[in-house]
């Protein structure tokens, strides 16, 4: 019995006892909260339900708690239910009910942890969306790791997720990129507002190799030749870097398509027709202050050209017109102002503003030997995704970026994350997984049927450390659901670290396999089943954050 099952049992029991005493059962919460008590001696789980609803129902807290304890004591899954303090209820599970969690994990396999929180929901998840003017920097790398992991968490919670990359190929930054390429191809200095770094020279050379006559023609023709070919080459490199990082997108959405298809013009006309725009100072303004923005936004500038927000307006409309129920934008620390304007744009167009979510990620800093690492050899300016992977590997890079909340800035110690020690969190978890795989291989050599461990006598698992490990396994589905609801995939990584620690404590005190010359006992099969279930959940957790689960290390 996992916490979710226990929550349902307690709620059903509470409804029955309240009805039996002719009291109002409608005061019960939708979900009863059950927690692990700080002191394990108090039981396996605890709930404050009686304190929460007794007075509303017309009873005293301890009185209701006693009714619950008496009723629960008659359930085969409950070994003991006792009252503490003003009405807390402590619960100890029967050994068979506790062991059933192990069988549940083994039978569910890779699906253990999945839930239906977002069943039937279509979610558009936009992340990275770096300009195609240079390699992905550390901020974009953080979003690549966190965004892909969040997509996995949402999918594990039943959602249909579209991973989307917004390709910014419309605007002045592309012109500056093209001018930088032309200058590099001619051997001239980088323009004052241009892009520098070795990658510019590489792409410029690539354009010339592809089109030896790229520098021939008028200035406009040369600019366009380097613009189109250069952007294509740069974006191909970005895609390759992301793919090697384990991140692929379902949709690469081109900003230019919004203008070329008439979507921008259509959205603006809709806003005009509905009275959501007004003309002032020769420009057209969105009445965004009516929807919580701090100021109205220019949509059409006085020169007749569309402002940047015009593309945003058409893009949010496109996302919902494609049938998405929720649009999540993952943006950098300098995009706080986008939250209100995106929600305002959606509401002005007639969509639910609460269906627009903006997650803001903070900066990432690299440290080596206590000193900041600031320069990329290739980019010439900032550290890139490829630099980080080269330093600590894909698994180290992804895990280091996903294990912390994006609300705070992050320092990555390259020496720590490259080390093969228990101080390295990803190594610690992966080592735990590999260690269990080694145990299972040894068990097979000893004649254990490792494919039938769900049938082991799991009610023999009564040691304190066995109980700690089983209860930790049982928490995984709730951790996944919470990570999805709060958009916090770092909870999965932290859980994996806790699970590894709890397993190591179990393994230190509970002999899993018989020693040489010892007879095989039923407890060995039960503990082997527990170890196998732990391996499965470790694998599921690592997979959910996009990190490998090696069988050997």
Swiss-Prot record:
What does the record list as coiled-coil region(s)? none
Instruction: Report the family membership.
Output: Belongs to the class-I aminoacyl-tRNA synthetase family.
Q: Which UniProt keywords apply?
A: Aminoacyl-tRNA synthetase, ATP-binding, Cytoplasm, Ligase, Nucleotide-binding, Protein biosynthesis
One GO location term (cellular component): cytoplasm
Reaction catalysed by this enzyme:
tRNA(Arg) + L-arginine + ATP = L-arginyl-tRNA(Arg) + AMP + diphosphate
Could you describe the subunit structure of this protein?
Answer: Monomer.
> Which Enzyme Commission number(s) are on file for it?
6.1.1.19
**Record's protein name:** Arginine--tRNA ligase
Does the UniProt entry include the keyword Lipoprotein? no
- Species of origin reads Corynebacterium aurimucosum (strain ATCC 700975 / DSM 44827 / CIP 107346 / CN-1)
**Top-level taxon of the source organism:** Bacteria
SMART domains, per this entry? Arg_tRNA_synt_N (SM01016), DALR_1 (SM00836)
The cross-references to PROSITE patterns, in alphabetical order and at most eight, read: AA_TRNA_LIGASE_I
Q: Where is this motif: 'HIGH' region?
A: 130-140
One GO BP annotation is: arginyl-tRNA aminoacylation
Q: Which NCBIfam families match?
A: argS
Gene Ontology molecular function, alphabetical: arginine-tRNA ligase activity; ATP binding
Report the subcellular localization.
Cytoplasm
- InterPro entries with a match to the protein in the record: aa-tRNA-synth_I_CS, Arg-tRNA-ligase, Arg-tRNA-synth_N, Arg-tRNA-synth_N_sf, ArgRS_core, DALR_anticod-bd, Rossmann-like_a/b/a_fold, tRNAsynth_Ia_anticodon-bd
The answer on whether this UniProt entry bears the keyword Cytoplasm reads yes
What top-level class of enzyme does the UniProt entry assign? ligase
């Amino acid at each position: 019995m996992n916490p979710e099952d226990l929550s349902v049992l307690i709620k059903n029991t509470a409804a029955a006892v309240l009805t039996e005493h002719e009291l109002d059962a409608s005061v019960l919460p939708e979900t009863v909260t059950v927690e692990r008590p700080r002191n394990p001696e108090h039981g396996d789980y605890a709930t404050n339900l009686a304190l929460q609803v007794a007075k509303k129902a017309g009873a005293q807290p301890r009185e209701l708690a006693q009714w619950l304890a008496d009723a629960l004591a008659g359930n085969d899954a409950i070994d003991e239910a006792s009252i503490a303090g003003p009405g807390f209820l402590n619960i100890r599970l029967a050994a068979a009910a506790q062991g059933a969690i192990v069988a549940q994990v083994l039978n569910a396999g890779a699906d253990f942890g999945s839930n239906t929180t977002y069943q039937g929901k279509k979610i558009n998840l936009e992340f990275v969306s770096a300009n195609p003017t240079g390699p992905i920097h550390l901020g974009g790398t953080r979003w690549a790791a966190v965004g892909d992991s969040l997509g996995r968490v949402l999918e594990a919670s039943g959602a249909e997720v579209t991973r989307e990359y917004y390709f910014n190929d419309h605007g002045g930054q592309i012109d500056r990129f093209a001018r930088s390429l032309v200058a590099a191809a001619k051997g001239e200095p980088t323009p004052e507002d241009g892009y520098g770094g070795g990658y510019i020279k590489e792409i410029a050379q690539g354009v010339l190799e592809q089109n030896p006559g790229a520098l021939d023609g008028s200035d406009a023709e040369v600019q366009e030749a380097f613009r189109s070919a250069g952007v294509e080459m740069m974006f191909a490199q970005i895609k390759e870097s992301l793919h090697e990082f384990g991140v692929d997108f379902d949709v690469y959405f081109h900003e230019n398509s919004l203008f070329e298809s008439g979507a921008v013009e259509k959205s603006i006309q809709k806003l005009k027709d509905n009275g959501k725009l007004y003309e002032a100072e020769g420009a057209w303004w969105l009445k965004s202050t009516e929807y919580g923005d701090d100021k109205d936004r220019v949509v059409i500038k006085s020169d007749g050209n569309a402002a940047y927000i015009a593309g945003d307006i058409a893009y949010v409309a496109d996302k919902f017109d494609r049938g998405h129920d929720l649009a999540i934008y993952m943006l950098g620390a300098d995009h706080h102002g986008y939250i209100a304007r995106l929600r305002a744009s959606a509401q002005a167009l007639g969509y639910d503003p609460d269906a627009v979510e903006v997650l803001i990620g903070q900066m990432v800093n690299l440290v080596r030997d206590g000193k900041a690492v600031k320069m990329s050899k290739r980019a010439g300016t900032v550290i890139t995704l490829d630099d980080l992977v080269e330093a600590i590997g894909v698994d180290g890079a992804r895990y280091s970026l996903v294990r912390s909340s994006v609300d705070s800035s992050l320092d990555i110690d390259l020496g720590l994350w490259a080390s093969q020690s228990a101080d390295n969190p990803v190594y610690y978890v992966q080592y735990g997984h590999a260690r269990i795989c080694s145990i299972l291989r040894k068990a097979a050599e000893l004649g254990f049927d490792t494919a039938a461990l769900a049938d082991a006598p799991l009610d023999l698992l009564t040691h304190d450390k066995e109980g700690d490990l089983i209860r930790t396994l049982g928490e995984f589905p709730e951790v996944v659901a919470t990570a999805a609801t709060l958009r916090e995939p770092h909870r999965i990584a932290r859980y994996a670290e806790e699970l590894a620690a709890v397993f190591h404590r179990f393994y230190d005190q509970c002999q899993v396999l018989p020693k040489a010359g010892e007879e095989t006992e039923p407890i060995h099969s039960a503990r082997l089943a527990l170890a196998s279930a732990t391996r499965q959940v470790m694998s599921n957790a690592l997979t959910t954050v996009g990190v490998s689960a090696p069988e050997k290390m």
